[in-house]
Amino acid sequence: MNCSRTAVKTEAEFRKLYQDAARGMELFYGVRITVPVKIQMVNAKRLHRSLGKTFVPTAKPDGRTLGVAIKRGNDYAILLENGSPRMSSLMTLVHEMTHIWQYLNWDMDAIRRKYGAEMELEIYEGMAKWSEIQYAYLMGETAEAKRAEICTRVRQDEYGRGFVKYLTRYPMSYATHLEGATPFEDKETPL
């Protein structure tokens, strides 16, 4: 498929995608984001600067960060790279919305005490990867979900290690309906 045909390019498209993701998360996981979230469409350079990284473009497609969830006091925002394919943008939104949900529902100090500071990122990122990949399966986007699952399983970072840990407790449902529990159901002990 030609990625540019499905690219999300306008603020209006991003807002619609956010609304779709919010409805899906409520339908699939029974969760709602109950605060206003500012959605910003940014270029890759600005997105990476917000992460404290430098963006170095390459001539070929590369796996890179497409979004970030930001909490500043009681304000929440999601920055998304513009021009990404629709399904990639949707999965990134679900990932970042999972972080917003975590900010709103988890006692971060209790999570750190329970799992240790060294596992904190695995707890957060593992759940967000689980959520985005499971969402793609539930949407019937099996090829995209399977690709993301395989790539994430072999990653040797907090995303991959965390995702594999979540799979142990919350196996993927490969159909278009959930067949078991989700990490959204246990706010004190998600893993």
Feature roles, as predicted:
Residues M1-R64:
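A metal-dependent hydrolase signature that marks the N-terminal structural subdomain at the beginning
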Residues A7-E13, L79-G83, Y115-A117:
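Second-shell loop/turn segments in exported
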Residues M25, M91-N105, E125, K129:
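Active-site recognition of the HExxH zinc-binding catalytic motif
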Residues G73-L93, M119-E120:
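Short pre-active-site segment immediately N-terminal to the catalytic Zn-binding motif
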Residues I100, L104, Q134-L138, M172:
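Active-site catalytic microenvironments for nucleophilic, acid-base chemistry
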Residues R113-V154:
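Post-HExxH zinc-binding segment in Zn-dependent metallohydrolases
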Residues L138-L191:
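Long, well-structured alpha-helical subdomains associated
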